[in-house]
């Protein structure tokens, strides 16, 4: 899927506290996009985003998307979510997390890790190997890397190391 985004977009992540959504939000923020989001409770992922001055709303409310121009939803978000419904009424572009991840992946050469067991460990090992080289990849992992104290990091090279989820079919959105 081709996604055309301007840096002036305000991208709202519904379910931003999840490990995959928080990592994606962090990368897009690092790329220069205006990022905000909401979740039902605060956690360590949200704390890391707030340290980057990303606006986070507690709870899902229609008013949270008043300035948003794009919506990204987690697979955990139900179709009766008030932010989702308000975005549909405003005719905002709505993307699944996997679609937005596919967009990020389309901008780089990728090493992708997929499977039912060991994805986070394998992605972490590959990211660690890359860190010993002069290649500085973008990393989106399914867990917090001790070396980064985060699950994601925007790199400076044209490479990315991505953990993809098979449970929601998001791996089908990325062309390695």
What kind of feature is each model-predicted range?
Residues 1-45, 50-55, 67-71, 89-92:
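ATP-dependent carboxylate-amine ligase
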Residues 37, 57, 161-163:
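Generic enzyme active-site microenvironment
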Residues 43, 58-62, 165:
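Structural motif corresponding to alpha-helix initiation and N-cap regions
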Residues 4, 27-33, 50, 63-64, ...:
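Phosphate-binding loop of NTP-binding sites
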Residues 56-59, 95:
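Short acidic-hydrophobic, aromatic-tinged amphipathic segments that line or gate anion-handling sites
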């Amino acid at each position: 899927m081709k996604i055309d985004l301007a840096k002036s977009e305000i991208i709202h992540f519904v379910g931003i506290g999840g490990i995959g959504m928080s990592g994606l939000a962090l990368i897009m923020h690092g790329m220069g996009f205006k990022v905000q989001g909401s979740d039902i409770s605060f956690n360590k992922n949200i704390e890391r985003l707030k340290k980057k001055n990303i606006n986070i709303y507690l709870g899902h409310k229609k008013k949270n998307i008043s300035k948003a121009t794009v919506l990204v939803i987690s697979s955990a978000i139900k179709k009766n979510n008030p932010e989702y419904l308000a975005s549909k009424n405003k005719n905002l572009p709505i993307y699944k997390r996997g679609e937005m991840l596919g967009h990020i992946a389309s901008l780089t050469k990728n090493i992708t890790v997929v499977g039912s067991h060991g994805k986070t460990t394998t992605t972490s090992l590959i990211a660690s190997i890359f860190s010993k080289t002069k290649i500085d990849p973008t990393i989106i992992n399914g867990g917090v890397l001790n070396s980064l104290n985060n699950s994601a990091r925007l790199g400076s090279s044209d490479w990315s190391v991505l953990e993809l989820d098979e449970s929601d079919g998001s791996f089908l959105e990325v062309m390695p």
